[in-house]
């Protein structure tokens, strides 16, 4: 766990970025610029299925070649090359009939947001999500130099382009402010908010992690953790550090907590947020 009194320290948000993308996509649904349950043109799946990891999109981060390339500090592949390597045109299962976590699916979500907003991702997220919540520390990492602004630096030369859906960096406080705002303010309509947190149940306890029930909403991990009940947010990780940002609505005084830790075990950050609450 990284402990500091400096509120301006920058951390990689890793897959917590997915929650921001999902929020932006649902804001566009609310504005009538995207459809949640209509099949996408020339695709077999819907936006809802992408957000809930039920579209069958093959996950590029499972590729051995991807792992080697990241370890070798290589530049990211071109998007088309990545899609070819993971056979993205061939769904792993019929959309809606299964569940499998997919970073590739969220690249498609990114493309949908940029097209519907007629803007680049960073600008779209600022306008759709961060401005309404008065959040100003968050930015989209595009270069190795951007990664070096984070508290741990970037000695391993990691390129954020490997997170094809977009890797956000920001303060721990703004991670909490974003998720707390999403959970307690009206940034989404009541109907869309309810759909976002509605869980697709996945399984039971996970060894080394605090989960008792695992589930996924629309861009949200939303199962139950030891001692705190419902746990709504997202964990994430990359080379050498991990994060967990969660809202706990069932504790006596509902609270939102974030933990950013060195290492590669997301369970460490998840256990830390539980400890901070109980």
Name each model feature, range by range.
Residues 1, 67-94, 119-141, 146-152:
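Short, charged, amphipathic alpha-helices and their helix-cap/turn boundaries
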Residues 1-4, 8-12, 119, 156-278:
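Catalytic loop of the DD-peptidase/beta-lactamase superfamily, centered on the K-T-G motif
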Residues 5-101:
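Active-site-proximal loop and beta-strand segments within enzyme catalytic domains
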Residues 14-34, 50, 86-87, 100-129, ...:
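Alpha-helical scaffold elements that line and support the substrate/ligand-binding pocket
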Residues 74, 97-105, 117, 160, ...:
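Short, contiguous, pocket-lining structural segments
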Residues 23, 54-57, 89-90, 128, ...:
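Alpha-helix boundary/capping residues
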Residues 27-44, 116-144, 189-194:
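Short, well-structured active-site flanking segments
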Residues 55-62, 132-142, 201-208:
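Secretory-pathway/luminal and periplasmic proteins that interact with or process carbohydrate-rich
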């Amino acid at each position: 766990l990284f402990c500091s009194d400096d509120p301006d320290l920058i951390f990689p948000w890793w897959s917590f970025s997915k929650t921001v993308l999902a929020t932006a996509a649902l804001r566009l649904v609310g504005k009538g610029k995207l459809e949640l349950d209509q099949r996408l043109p020339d695709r077999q799946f819907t936006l809802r299925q992408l957000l809930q990891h039920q579209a069958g999109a093959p996950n590029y981060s499972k590729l051995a070649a991807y792992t080697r390339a990241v370890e070798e500090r290589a530049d990211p592949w071109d998007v088309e090359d990545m899609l070819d390597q993971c056979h993205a045109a061939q769904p792993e299962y019929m959309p809606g009939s299964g569940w499998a976590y997919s970073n590739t699916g969220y690249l498609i979500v990114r493309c949908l947001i940029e097209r519907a907003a007629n803007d680049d991702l960073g600008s779209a997220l600022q306008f759709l999500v961060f401005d309404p919540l008065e959040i100003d520390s968050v930015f989209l990492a595009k270069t190795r130099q951007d990664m070096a602004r984070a508290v741990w630096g970037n000695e391993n030369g990691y390129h954020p382009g490997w997170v094809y859906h977009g890797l956000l960096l920001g303060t721990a406080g703004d991670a909490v402010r974003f998720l707390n705002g999403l959970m307690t303010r009206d940034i989404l309509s009541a109907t869309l908010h309810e759909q976002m947190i509605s869980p697709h149940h996945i399984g039971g306890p996970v060894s080394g992690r605090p989960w008792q029930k695992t589930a996924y909403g629309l861009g949200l991990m939303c199962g139950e953790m030891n001692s705190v009940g419902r746990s709504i947010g997202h964990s994430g990780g990359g080379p050498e550090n991990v994060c967990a940002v969660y809202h706990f609505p069932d504790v006596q005084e509902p609270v939102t907590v974030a933990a950013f830790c060195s290492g590669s075990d997301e369970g460490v950050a998840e256990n830390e947020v539980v400890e901070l609450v109980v």
